[in-house]
C-alpha cells in the first residue's frame, strides 16, 4: 500500500510512528482533536495553525470551562527551571489544581518560527512537559528533518507540512504527524481513527508523488542549503537589514514597503509567490495576506537553481526597488 510505504520512509527518517494527512493544516487539527487540550501554550507563526487553535478555543467548552491559551510568562510561573520542579503556588496553576486538572495539556512550538526564523529552547519546554504531563508537539516544517531532530530534544509529536520540503516540487498538498515511540500505540490509533472519520486521508496520487519526492529529499535540501549560504553571503553586502538565516530559507527587510513590493514584482527568474521548500526559488511578501507581519519583510525559499543566476536576479530586482 503506497500510503504505508511513504509513512515507513518518514518513520525511518524521524524515528517514530508516522500518520499522513491531506494537508499540514489537517494534521495539526487532528492532533488538537485527539488531545482535546484545556490548557495550551502556543508558539506558532503559521497563520493557519493559529486559526485552528483560535477556532478550537472558541468552540470547545469542557465542563463549562473555556479552553485557556497560556502565555510564555505563565509557563515560566508554573515551572522553576533552576530547581527543575513545578511552582505549586503559581497563580497560573492554582485554578487547574483546584479542579484536579493538569497545569498544561499541550505545548505547540513552531521551530524555527515562520517567517522570522527565530528558535525556541525545545529542551526547556520538554522539561516543562515532563513535569506537567503535557504533550510537546513541534511543527518542524521550516527546518525539515535534515535541519532539526525534535525527538532528540524531548518532543512527543513532530508535524510537517509535507507540501514543503518533504515533497519539494510544489505539486501536492500533504501533512504528517510523527509520534514518538514513548507514547502508546493507543494514541496513534486515535489519530488514525480521527483521520478516517474527518476525511483527512491523503489521496492516492498525492501519496505516490510524496513517495517519489522522498527519494530525492536529501539531494534537494542539501543543494538548497549550499545555495542559501552563497546567497546570504552576497546579501550581507547589500542594503538590506534584519537578515535571519536558516538553511534553505531566510528573511530580510528592505527600507520601505514600496521597496519590498517592487523587489517582488521585479523578479525575472525567481517567483514572487507563497509557499516554500520547492525546487524553485520563491520570494514571499507575507504582509499582503498577513498584516501582522512587517510590510518591509520578504521571506526567501531557495530552490536548486545556480547561485549565480539567483544573485543576478536579486541584483536587478534590488536596483529596480531603489
Where in this protein do the model-derived segments appear?
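A glycine-/small-polar-enriched, mobile loop at the entrance of the PLP active site in fold-type I
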Residues: 1-12, 16-17
